[in-house]
Each structure stands twice: as structure tokens, then as C-alpha cells.
């Protein structure tokens, strides 16, 4: 219990600061938006049971509001305070390593806000704007605390509800004095509600620590009754704890604090050891105070807050109680704010001791958070002897006096300046107990200020002299002493009331003895003043556990409602506020002790990150697999698309080839069709020609048949008679003379029939020749011996014929018997046709016949002329000459040399057709 209470005191102080920073303005919020702390605060206002989980609390509150006739969906609460406390609670769950404090803060946030506001006003008096701790240790603590808070938030709420029930049971058993003290504490808390919310802790770590601390303080104040079991524990543990404290002294407390920090922040252990060597005396005093606080958790946190404000000589009992609570707050802030600083819990003790000098009980509080984590050790410390508690009181007073001049403000800081920078800067001129960088939360973007606590006032003065108006990070800084006296006076008033309370409770003195032992150790280290020691002893006596808690609350109500505690480890003032409902908080503080022990087994920050890392890696792997799968699908789709395109191209190429083949086939068929058409035309032409030739042959045959019919009687007569009859000879002569003397005997031919068949001269020639050959036989070749002799023979023949004819005409004798005129006529026809065939020149031109006629007339003798006419009519006997001419008419020749009845048939059809 003592440990829990001390832890609550620390966290309560920090929480008070956080809550006070939040304004107490009221606003409407939905029931579902309220946190467990808010729900319990509303239930407490309505005197309704506030134990149970969130769902049960919401049901109760809803029913209570409906009974009042209000709207359960909209509840009027201090909205700003709640919001800010919620922030800090989430952050302050970082210090939940000291889980006890955090739980208390959560439940009592409503009450704690009032106390915090009052303490914040004190901070304003000290010119503190928002406290934001930048120390390395504090930062580390914050991160660890966050992890712890996340893991144990649910457990804390449950433990808080259980602790409330336990506290209620204890309350009944507690002596009336304790109840009175609790009542006084509530009054003090109500007074503190007026505190301003100007200052807000900037640093996340510090803020979270403040809220849980505040809640713890509220629990301690409201549940002074709970201190009764603490008294029992303290009585049991007094002897062993006294032995432990006497033997170990500050070291034991440092070890406990280290354990606490290690549970919450395993890294802090090493730093704690380092700081332990530097501030061994201070840490010992703080440890002793913490032991007292642990014994009387309910009273001490409240008193500690008030005493923190008091720098010097107030009633020792009051100072110690207030200082213990304030120190608890400061320590909780340190734990939350300085993860790096946390590694040195002992160093914090030393720093807290420095603050205790400023505010007599400051030292008590810092060990309280450490001891809250190590609740068992705290219980043992409760059993320390009363003498030790008296010694502790003296040391606290000395510390408070000395700490008054150890604090100073640094203004004009750069926005990049951290608490570690200040610590490094001022450590050149002495040991820096604590350093913080704060700003005004109400005005965002406000300038930052530094609050530094040195181990001694001389070192602080040296720092002010050397570093005032110097440059840091490109900015001119001014260093001025902090004014802590008004707060100290208020805490002294509280201590007076606490002193009265101390007299009323004897059981608390056992815990005070334990504190005295611790104070003795601290006195050895810091050589505290005797007066302050006496005050601390008185305070220890007054605080026999829960009774001290009640006294602290009473003193707080009597003194200033707001108390500022100097966080000596960080050199920053911390506001501690006490709120109503402290009774329930006391039970919560016990639960928090157990929670803090559980938190000792809190996993490290890396372990907390491991599942997150694994989840991230899994998500990354899933994303990577999904992207790879998409890429594979894309590649497959592209491949299939390429294949489809290739197939389509092949199909198109095949179609083009097929079309080309078809086109070529069509062209071939067209060519064949044209060829066939051409052949068909040629065939038609050939057939036409054959038909025409056949018709011509028929005509020629007809003519030839008619001609022999006309000529046959003459031939028969000539053949039958060896000599021509006289009549015929006379007629023949007459005809010859008339025919050959007549110049135009060939001009009566029908020229229209002459070119009737010009294209078929060759056929006609052949046909006529064949017919003549058939008709006339083979007499010509036999007589004339071949075509080569034709010209001469014919000429000779014609010449002879002509001479013979003339002679016959002149003599009147028949022609010589050797000549057969009929045969000769036939032979002449053959000869003439033979010459025509040899020359290949058949011309039916009438002019040629005329020329022939003229040439014939120009010669002597009709026979000669006939022969020459035949030749000249052709113009040439070249074999390849044009063969357009007609063969010489048979009848013409015959008539030429025969003179046979030429005049009787001058217009014979044979002449026309022949030409």
C-alpha cells in the first residue's frame, strides 16, 4: 500500500499538472465517447457504485441520467479536462510500467482535474509554461510506457474496480481519524479545482505520467481509509524494512527504484546506477521519504503535493506528506518523460532529493513511483522505525531549504533545444539534478523555457553568473532564479494541518520511522538541516499510513490548493493535484501496486514491435506476392496475346495466299477462256472459209460442167472428122480474121465479175487446174517436156500456129495433119495454167489484159501476140510474186489461138466467170 500510495503521489502530481493544464470548462459529450475514468467520475458525482468494466459503468450512468430526467446521449462534463487527461493517460500509460499509478489516475481523472488545476496555478506562479521533458531517459521511459500501457490498460481498469471494492471494505475498518482525514482531503481537492489550466506538459512522456499520477493521487486522497491495511502491512514490515533500509540505506531504495524502472523500462537500470553514484545522498533521502510514503500511501500523496510547494520550514509532518506526494508526481513524470533518464532511477532519486530541498517532501515522491513498481519493497520500508522517519523529516526540510535556490529558468531557448542540451550546458558549472524544456500549452507556438535544478544553490548561482545573456543554438538565453517560496509557504500551511493529523495517528509513525531511516541516509549524503529533519519526523509521525494521507489532504486544503513539486531528477517543477474520490483511489492504488508488479514483466519495446514487424513483413510479402502474381498474369496474358496475334497473322497470310491462288486461277481461266474464244473464232473463220471455198468449187464445177457441154459437139465433130468441113473452115477463117483484127475484142468483158472472188484466187487456180487436168488429161507434159520449156514451146507453138494459120488462110488449105486442133487447144489451156501456177502471179486487172492486147497487136501474128500478152500481163514470172491475179481465162486463150466461133458467143458466161 505504501508503495502504491507513493507511486500514486508521484503520478498524481504529474497527473495533476496534466489535468490542471486542461481547462475545467464544461461541455456536452456523448455517453459512448466517455472513458472509463469519466464514467466513474460521473457515477461518483451521482453517488452510484463506480466499480466494474466499461459496459457496466455505461449502463449505470445511463440509468442514473435517465432517472434524473436528463439525456443519456449528451452528458455535461469538463470536456477540455477530459480531453487533455485522455491524452496524458494514453501517454502516461507509458509510465504504466508503474501501472499502479496509471490505474489510479484513470479512475480518478475527474477528481484529479480539480487538484491538477490548483497545482497548475502554482506552476504559473513559478512561471512554468508547459512542462515538456526532453531528457533521454525520460524519452525512453515514454516509449516503454506506451507499450506497457497498451498491454495493461484493460488489466488496470479491472484492477482499479477491484481495488475500489477492497478500499470500501477497508474504509469501514479504518479509524474515524482516517475518515476525517479523507474528508479533509476531499475539501482540499475541491479547493484545488480552481487552479488554472494554463500549463500543459508538452512532452508526451511527462503528460502520460501526470495523468496516471494524478489519478493515483486522487485515489490516495479519497481513500485514506485504505491506509489501514497499509498500516497493518507497515507494522508487519517495519522491522524487516527498517533492517533493509538501515543496512542498505539509499542503496536499497535505489535498487528498488531500479527494479521499478527495469520493470517498466529495462534500459533504465544502467542509468540509475550511474546517477546513483552522483546523487547518492539525495537518493537516500528520497528513498527514505518514499518509504514513508509507501507506508502511508493515502495521506502522503496529498501532503506531499502541498509540501512540494513549500521550499522551507513548514510543519515537518505537513511538509513531508506534501513533499512525498509531489515527489511521487515528479518521479512519475520523470519515469514517463525520461526513458533515458529512467535508466538512472537513483539519479532521479538524487534529483528528486534536490527538489525535496526546494519543497521539503519532494524527495519522498520520486521514490514513490519507483517503489510503486516495487510495491513489496515499499511495504518492507513501511516497517522502518519512527526515529528513521524523524531523521528523514529533518533531511527533507534541509533539502527544501537548499532546493529553493537551486532552480532557475532559462528563457529565449531555440525551438531545437532539448533538455539534454541544457543539462550538458549547465553541467559544466556543477551537477545538474534536473532539466526540462516547457512551453505554454494554451498558446500554440509559444516560446520554450528551460527549468533547471542544480545540486546546490551555489552551483545554480554560478550557472546564472556564467551563462546569463549567452548564446545557445544561435539564440540569446537569459538565466534567472526560480521563485518557489510562495509555493513553499502554501505547503507549509498544509504541513501544519498535516502535523495535527500526524499526532492523531500512531500507526503512521511506524512508517515514519522507516522514512526516518531513509532520511538519515539522505542526511548523511546531503547534511540536511535539523529543523527540516524535525518537520519530516513530525510529518512521519502524523502519517501512520492512511492517516498521513488524510492529513496531507487536510493540509493541502488549508494551504494553497495547488502545489508545485520540484522534480529534482529533471530539475522541473511538477504540479500535484488532489481530487475527491480519494478513497476509491486508495483501493485503486493497491490494485495498481499489483499491476505495477505485473508490469515488471512487461515485454520490452522490441518485443512489442516484433508482432508489428511480423505483420508488416507479412503484409509486405503479401503485397509482393500479389504484385508478382499480377506480373505473372500480365506476362501470361501478353504471351497469349502474342500467340493469338501470331495465329491471326498466319491466318491472314494463309487467306492472302489463298486469295492470290484464286486470283491466279481466275487469270489462268480467263486466259484459257480468251484462248478458247480465239480458237473458236479462228475455227469459225476456218469453217467459213471452207464453206466459201466449197461454194466456189461448186460454182467452178458447175461452170466447167456447162462449158464442156457447150464445147463438146464441136470437139466431137472435130475428133470424129479427120478434116474440118469446108463450111467450118470458112467460118473459122472469117472468125479468126475478125477476131484478131478487132482491137477491142477483150473490152466487152463484164468487169464486175472479174473481182468477185479475189481472196480465193489460189483455190480457184488449184480447182481449175485440177478440173482441167481431169478433163484434158496428160497431153501437155508429154508433148512439151516440162514447165521449163513452156515459154519457148508456147512461143514456138503460137508462132507456128500463127504462121500456119496465116498460110492456111492464104492458101485456103486445112492445117497440117500433124496438128490436132482439139488436142492443141487442150494443151494450150494446160500450158497457160501451168505458166500461171509457176509464176504465182494471177492478175485479173483489165488494164493488164489491155496491155496484153496492145502488145499482142503490136506483134506480127495473133499467135505471137497472144503469147506475149499472156506474159506481159503478169509482168514477171518470179515464183514468189504476188499471186492476186486470176488465171488467164481458158476460153480467152482458146479463142485467141483457136478462133473457134468467137464471134458467135462474144459474151459467153465463161469469160466473165473466168475473170
Swiss-Prot record:
InterPro entries: Nucleotide-bd_a/b_plait_sf, RBD_domain_sf, RRM_dom, SAF_Modulators, SAFB1_2_RBD, SAP_dom, SAP_dom_sf. Residues 1-24, 319-330 have a biased composition (Low complexity). GO terms for molecular function: chromatin binding; double-stranded DNA binding; RNA binding; RNA polymerase II cis-regulatory region sequence-specific DNA binding; sequence-specific DNA binding. Pfam families: RRM_1, SAP. This is Scaffold attachment factor B1. One of its GO terms (cellular component) is nucleus. It comes from Homo sapiens. Residues 1-33, 64-118, 221-407, 477-641, 671-708, 749-915 are annotated as: Disordered.
Amino acid at each position: 500500500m505504501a508503495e502504491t500510495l507513493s507511486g500514486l503521489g508521484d503520478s498524481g502530481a504529474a497527473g495533476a499538472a496534466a489535468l490542471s493544464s486542461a481547462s475545467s470548462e464544461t461541455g456536452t459529450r456523448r455517453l459512448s465517447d466517455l472513458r472509463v475514468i469519466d464514467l466513474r467520475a460521473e457515477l461518483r458525482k451521482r453517488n452510484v457504485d463506480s466499480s466494474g468494466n466499461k459496459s457496466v459503468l455505461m449502463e449505470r450512468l445511463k440509468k442514473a441520467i435517465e432517472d434524473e430526467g436528463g439525456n443519456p446521449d449528451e452528458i455535461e462534463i469538463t470536456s477540455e479536462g477530459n480531453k487533455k487527461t485522455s491524452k496524458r493517460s494514453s501517454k502516461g500509460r507509458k509510465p504504466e510500467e508503474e501501472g499502479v499509478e496509471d490505474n489510479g489516475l484513470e479512475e480518478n481523472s475527474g477528481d484529479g482535474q480539480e487538484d491538477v488545476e490548483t497545482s497548475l496555478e502554482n506552476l504559473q506562479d513559478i512561471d512554468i509554461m508547459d512542462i515538456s521533458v526532453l531528457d533521454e531517459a525520460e524519452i525512453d521511459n515514454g516509449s516503454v510506457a506506451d507499450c506497457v500501457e497498451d498491454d495493461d490498460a484493460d488489466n488496470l481498469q479491472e484492477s482499479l474496480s477491484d481495488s475500489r471494492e477492497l478500499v470500501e471494505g477497508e474504509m469501514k475498518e479504518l479509524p474515524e481519524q482516517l475518515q476525517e482525514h479523507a474528508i479533509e482531503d476531499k475539501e482540499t481537492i475541491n479547493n484545488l479545482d480552481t487552479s488554472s489550466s494554463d500549463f500543459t506538459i508538452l512532452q508526451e512522456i511527462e503528460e502520460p505520467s501526470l495523468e496516471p499520477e494524478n489519478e493515483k493521487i486522487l485515489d490516495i486522497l479519497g481513500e485514506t481509509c485504505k491506509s489501514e491495511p497499509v498500516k497493518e502491512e507497515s507494522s508487519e514490515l517495519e522491522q524487516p524494512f527498517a533492517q533493509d533500509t538501515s543496512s542498505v540505506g539509499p542503496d536499497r531504495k535505489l535498487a528498488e527504484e531500479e527494479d521499478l524502472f527495469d520493470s517498466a523500462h529495462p534500459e533504465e537500470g544502467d542509468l540509475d546506477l550511474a546517477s546513483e553514484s552522483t546523487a547518492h545522498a539525495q537518493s537516500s533521502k528520497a528513498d527514505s521519504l518514499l518509504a514513508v510514503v509507501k507506508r502511508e500511501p493515502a495521506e502522503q500523496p496529498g501532503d506531499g503535493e502541498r509540501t512540494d510547494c513549500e521550499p522551507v520550514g513548514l510543519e515537518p509532518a505537513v511538509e513531508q506528506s506534501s513533499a512525498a506526494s509531489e515527489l511521487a508526481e515528479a518521479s512519475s513524470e520523470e519515469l514517463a518523460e525520461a526513458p533515458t533518464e529512467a535508466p538512472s532511477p537513483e539519479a532521479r532519486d538524487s534529483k528528486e532529493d534536490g527538489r525535496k530541498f526546494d519543497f521539503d517532501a519532494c524527495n519522498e515522491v520520486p521514490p514513490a513511483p519507483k517503489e510503486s513498481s516495487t510495491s513489496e519493497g515499499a511495504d518492507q520500508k513501511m516497517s522502518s522505525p519512527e526515529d528513521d522517519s524523524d531523521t528523514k523529516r529533518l533531511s527533507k526540510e534541509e533539502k527544501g531549504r537548499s532546493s529553493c535556490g537551486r532552480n532557475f529558468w532559462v528563457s529565449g531557448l531555440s525551438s531545437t533545444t532539448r533538455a539534454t542540451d541544457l543539462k550538458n550546458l549547465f553541467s559544466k558549472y556543477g551537477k545538474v539534478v534536473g532539466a526540462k524544456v516547457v512551453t505554454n500549452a494554451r498558446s500554440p507556438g509559444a516560446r520554450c523555457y528551460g527549468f533547471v535544478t542544480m545540486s546546490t544553490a551555489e552551483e545554480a548561482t554560478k550557472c546564472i553568473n556564467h551563462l546569463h545573456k549567452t548564446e545557445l543554438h544561435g539564440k540569446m538565453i537569459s538565466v534567472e532564479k526560480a521563485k518557489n517560496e510562495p509555493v513553499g509557504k502554501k505547503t507549509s500551511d498544509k504541513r501544519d494541518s498535516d502535523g495535527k493529523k500526524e499526532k492523531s495517528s500512531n500507526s503512521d509513525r511506524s512508517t515514519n520511522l522507516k522514512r526516518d531511516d531513509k532520511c538519515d541516509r539522505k542526511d548523511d549524503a546531503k547534511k540536511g538541516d535539523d529543523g527540516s529533519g524535525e518537520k519530516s519526523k513530525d510529518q512521519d509521525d502524523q502519517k501512520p499510513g492512511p492517516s498521513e494521507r488524510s492529513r496531507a489532504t487536510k493540509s493541502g486544503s488549508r494551504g494553497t490548493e495547488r502545489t508545485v513539486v520540484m522534480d529534482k531528477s529533471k530539475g522541473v517543477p511538477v504540479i500535484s493535484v488532489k481530487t475527491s474520490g480519494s478513497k476509491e483511489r486508495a483501493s485503486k492504488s493497491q490494485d495498481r501496486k499489483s499491476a505495477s508488479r505485473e508490469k515488471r514483466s512487461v515485454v520490452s519495446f522490441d518485443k512489442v514491435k516484433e508482432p508489428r514487424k511480423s505483420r508488416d513483413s507479412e503484409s509486405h510479402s503479401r503485397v509482393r506476392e500479389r504484385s508478382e502474381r499480377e506480373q505473372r498474369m500480365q506476362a501470361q496474358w501478353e504471351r497469349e496475346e502474342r500467340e493469338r496475334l501470331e495465329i491471326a497473322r498466319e491466318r491472314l497470310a494463309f487467306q492472302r495466299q489463298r486469295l492470290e491462288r484464286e486470283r491466279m486461277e481466275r487469270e489462268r481461266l480467263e486466259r484459257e477462256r480468251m484462248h478458247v474464244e480465239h480458237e473458236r473464232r479462228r475455227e469459225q473463220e476456218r469453217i467459213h472459209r471452207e464453206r466459201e471455198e466449197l461454194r466456189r468449187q461448186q460454182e467452178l464445177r458447175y461452170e466447167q460442167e456447162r462449158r464442156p457441154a457447150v464445147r463438146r459437139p464441136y470437139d466431137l465433130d472435130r475428133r470424129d472428122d479427120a478434116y474440118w468441113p469446108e463450111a467450118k473452115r470458112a467460118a473459122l477463117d472469117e472468125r479468126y480474121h475478125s477476131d484478131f483484127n478487132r482491137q477491142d475484142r477483150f473490152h466487152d468483158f463484164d468487169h464486175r465479175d472479174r473481182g468477185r472472188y479475189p481472196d480465193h484466187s489460189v483455190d480457184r487456180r488449184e480447182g481449175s487446174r485440177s478440173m482441167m487436168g481431169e478433163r484434158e488429161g496428160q497431153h501437155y507434159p508429154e508433148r512439151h517436156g516440162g514447165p521449163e520449156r513452156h515459154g519457148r514451146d508456147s512461143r514456138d507453138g503460137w508462132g507456128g500456129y500463127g504462121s500456119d494459120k496465116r498460110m492456111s488462110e492464104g492458101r485456103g488449105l486445112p492445117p497440117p495433119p500433124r496438128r490436132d486442133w482439139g488436142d492443141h487447144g487442150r494443151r494450150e489451156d494446160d500450158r497457160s495454167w501451168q505458166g500461171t501456177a509457176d509464176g504465182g502471179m494471177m492478175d485479173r486487172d483489165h488494164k493488164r489484159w489491155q496491155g496484153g492486147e496492145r502488145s499482142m497487136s503490136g506483134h506480127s501474128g495473133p499467135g505471137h501476140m497472144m503469147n506475149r500478152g499472156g506474159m506481159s500481163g503478169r509482168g514477171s514470172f518470179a515464183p514468189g510474186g504476188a499471186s492476186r491475179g486470176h488465171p488467164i481465162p481458158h476460153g480467152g486463150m482458146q479463142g485467141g489461138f483457136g478462133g473457134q466461133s468467137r464471134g458467135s458467143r462474144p459474151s459467153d458466161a465463161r469469160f466473165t466467170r473466168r475473170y
